[in-house]
Amino acid sequence: KVSLQELLSTPNNKSLLKRLGRENILSSKSEPGTQAIFFASAKSKPELFYLLWFYKDEAAYKKHVASANYKKFTSASAEILASKKAISLKKRATFSKNLTPERLKDAYFHITNLSLLAKSDAKFEKLVKKYMQKSVDEGAYAQFAFSQKDAPNKWVLVEIYKDEASFESYRHSENYKAYAKERAGLIDEFDGFGLKNETSFSKVKF
């Protein structure tokens, strides 16, 4: 089970949202069914945040959203958010390598929202799995691909690297060039941007 939220803080409340997010995430770490949480802010728009959760199953998700610390986070953050959007996702491909606290601390995240052309879903999933695994083998910390439950042609890709230089270096690799060439005939439009890690942890290998 996976959950994604896009949070936009009001202009003067970025620091408060970071603190509230951090408290909620650190409290959630002890929940057995919560596998990983990634909380990051957009580099070009620091008041825009993304919260990505991975749960063992639906029961673990329900337990988390019913918890006192999650309710506290929701009510406290409601007052300082300009907008909040929950995006319902289906996991399509996930690969990771050594997502330790030390590695995640200064990690560079990249999120891409894309729309596929009609009937490209299965082909794109195959393509993503092929190249994402290789990317993690070649140095990326993690590669996650999801489709939106209510719009299966809309996908969200989340990538984690050591830093922005590692991300740029991957973009010039033969693996990425081959992927970009193959996906060209499947994608209608896409938009990607960098994120800065705020508070993240992972207790599992994807």
Segment roles from a protein language model:
Residues 1-49, 56-66, 71, 78-206:
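Short S/T/G/P-rich N-terminal loop/turn motif that feeds into the first structured element of a domain
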